[in-house]
Amino acid sequence: MKDIEDLIEKAVELQSNGLISAQIADELNISRETVTWLLTRSKKEEATPAPKDISVDWSSIGKSAKRLHNISLALCDMVLETMEKVNAEVDVVVGIAANGVPLASMMAYELDADFAIYHRKGQGIVHAGHRGTISRNFGSVAGKNCIIVDDVITTGSTSMEVIEQLKEMDAKPRVVTVLVDKKGVDTIYNVPIQSLVRIARVD
């Protein structure tokens, strides 16, 4: 129960710092549904069941450039294995802001590829016709083989959004690579998912 209380405390603190639910979900690597539950749960309401979610804390990796580099090497190895199967080269590594960017930049360096950043619009709040964008300050993706990098897949909605956006820009999304896959799917829109860790709930 201590872990739940810690998550509630962190969620409340982030909210008091002005973050919205989607940003809190990104920061704590949990679903938006879980954030809502944490923020609305009173200490007396023990009967309310928690959403089925798993919190992922990878800060022990994120705070060390050396560890980030070593993890990026493992992700590169998985990407190259996938790219060999489709006989394609990596042209651009696209990091999903904010948590995918450090890994993506290191991977781009290791793979001798261009580097691009995808900024989510509204931090994951979905409105018809409103999506994120590829930053113009970094590599171009048009007509290129793209690798998508993020830290955690929870629902897959961000990966879907990036894949759709890349296809609209005439890019070729080839693989999505993450540290942790909480959704447990092999592909999203026929793009392979490669993760260091895949989590499966057994209920």
From Swiss-Prot:
Contains an N-terminal DNA-binding winged helix-turn-helix domain and a C-terminal regulatory domain (or effector binding domain) resembling phosphoribosyltransferase (PRT) domain. SUPFAM superfamilies: PRTase-like. Keywords: DNA-binding, Transcription, Transcription regulation. GO terms for biological process: pyrimidine nucleobase biosynthetic process; regulation of gene expression; UMP biosynthetic process. PROSITE patterns: PUR_PYR_PR_TRANSFER (PS00103). InterPro entries: GfcR-like, PRibTrfase_dom, PRTase-like. NCBIfam families: PRK02277.1 (NF002620). This is Transcriptional regulator GfcR 2. One of its GO terms (molecular function) is orotate phosphoribosyltransferase activity. Gene3D superfamilies: 3.40.50.2020. Belongs to the purine/pyrimidine phosphoribosyltransferase family. GfcR subfamily.
